[in-house]
Amino acid sequence: SDIEAARNKLVAEGIDIGNFIEGEGKDEDSGEIRTWKNLFLPFSLTRGLFTFLIQHEDGCIPSHKDKFDAAVTRLDHVVINTNDPEGIISLYGDTFGIRLALDQTVEQWGGRMLFFRLNHTTLEVIAKKNDEQPEDSLWGLAWVVTDIKKTYDRLISEGLEVTDVKEGRKPNTLVATVKSNTCNIPTLLIQHL
C-alpha cells in the first residue's frame, strides 16, 4: 500500500519511525464502518509540525448532500511559516517527494514564498530566514466551499464569527475568514469562481 511504501522509504533513509495505528469510525446515521491506517511522524523529522500520514482502507467518508452547497468540500491550502527555506525544500521535496511548484520572493507578502503541490492541495510556505534553530509552524488553513455566501449564512446562523465575503487575493476567488471556533488557527474559506 502507499502508506507502507512511505514508511519503508523513511526507514530506509534511517529515520526512526513508529508503527501504524489502525483507526475505525462509524457513521451514526447509516451505521457504515470506515477504517484507516495512521503513521505519526516524529517531530525530529517534521521540524516541530504535528504531522501524520493516513490511508483510508474500507468504507467512505459520509456525504451530507442536503448541506453540500453550504459545506467545506476539501482542503485548498495549508500555510506554514519557516526560518529555513532550504531545509523545508529538502524535507518536502526530497524526503516526502512533494513537487515544488513555485519558489518566489514576494516582498508585499513577507518574503520568500514556496508552493508545494500535492494532489489538489497546496502547501504554502512563508520563509523568513534567521539564525535561530530551524523551526516550522502551522500558520493557517484554507478550505474550499461550493457557495461561500450559503456557507457564510450557515456559519453565522450557528453562532460563529465570520468576516464579510470579499474578493480573494487570487483572481476569480471569493474569501471569508472564520474568526471563532478555530483553535486559534487562522482559517479561510475560499470559493473558486
How should these model regions be labeled?
Residues 68-127:
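Aromatic-anchored, glycine/proline-accented short structural segments
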Residues 2-9, 86, 148-153:
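Short, conserved charged micro-motifs
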Residues 110, 137, 172:
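Exposed loop/turn and edge beta-strand positions of beta-sandwich/beta-sheet ligand-binding modules
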